[in-house]
Design a protein with these regions (language model features):
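Short glycine-/aliphatic-rich beta-strand segments at the starts of folded cytosolic domains
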Residues: 1-14
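A generic structural motif
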Residues: 44-49
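Short amphipathic alpha-helices in soluble, non-transmembrane regions
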Residues: 22-29, 59-68
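Conserved short beta-strand edge segments in small beta-sheet-based binding/regulatory domains
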Residues: 36, 67-74
Length: 74
């Protein structure tokens, strides 16, 4: 059975759409990440689905904080 975890990370709302797209791409390259997209209703929430045996939420958040040092789990 595959392990699956889901997290939502709050990013600064002023991040440009091109920056959000780039950030999604950067998160998707992690081994174990199957989904990384910004929420269509709340544009500053990044939803990530991943296998916690392959990558941790802390590693994902660390990468997101390169774009927004105040990013946090929601």
């Amino acid at each position: 059975m595959n392990d699956i975890a889901v997290i939502t990370i709050r990013i600064h709302p002023d991040l440009l759409s091109v920056q959000r797209a780039r950030l999604e791409e950067e998160i998707r390259v992690f081994d174990g990440v199957t989904f990384a997209r910004f929420n269509h209703g709340v544009k500053h929430w990044l939803n990530v689905v991943y296998n916690p045996k392959s990558v941790t939420s802390k590693i994902i958040l660390k990468r997101v904080r390169k774009w927004d040092k105040n990013a946090a789990f929601f």
